[in-house]
Every structure is written in C-alpha cells, then in structure tokens.
Amino acid sequence: MEIRRQGLIVWLHSLKQAKMLRKFGNVHYVSKRLKYVVVYCNMEDAERIIAKIRSYSFVKQVDLSYKPFLKMEFESKQDKAKEYDYKAGL
C-alpha cells in the first residue's frame, strides 16, 4: 500500500521559523533567497495542515504542488532523421 503524498510550498516573511514547519511533515527544501519551504505531508491531511500553517503570522502564502495531478507517462515523437529519410525513394 502506497501512501499518497502532497507537496506544500510555504512562502515566509522570515526564515527564522522554517524549523517550526517540521512538525507538519517532511521539510524537503528551504530556499534562502526566495524565502520558501517545501513540505511533504499525507494527501488526506493536506487541507487540515494548510489551514493550520496559514494561521501563523510569519507565513505569507501556502500553495499546493501540482505534481500528483500531472500525467507522468509521455508519448514519444518520431525521430526527425527518419521523417526526412531521402534514401527511401531510391
């Protein structure tokens, strides 16, 4: 059984409180220059965690990651070399 995970992007006013976000899930990345933190949590708990994180005064904004909703199976295109094969008519 695989647990579905959801990424949360938390924009902060100051990075001093970034450690405090560890209690909500796994802190995957902290950007010092852009002042945001990527936190992974269980998908069924995401709405409750977002509401709790937004209540803090040091949080500017909380965004959801769209990665779980993207189709990760890609179709291959034909090779351009095969498309312009000039020796086929000889």
Swiss-Prot record:
Q: Where in the cell is it found?
A: Cytoplasm
Instruction: Name the domain of life.
Output: Bacteria
- UniProt KW keywords: Cytoplasm
GO cellular component labels: cytoplasm
Q: Tell me, what's a Pfam family for it?
A: DUF2129
Q: Which InterPro entries match?
A: DUF2129 (IPR016979)
Q: List the disulfide bonds.
A: none
Record's keyword annotation contains Cytoplasm: yes
Q: What family name appears in the similarity comment?
A: Belongs to the UPF0298 family.
Protein's UniProt name = UPF0298 protein BLi01717/BL02989
Recorded source organism is Bacillus licheniformis (strain ATCC 14580 / DSM 13 / JCM 2505 / CCUG 7422 / NBRC 12200 / NCIMB 9375 / NCTC 10341 / NRRL NRS-1264 / Gibson 46)
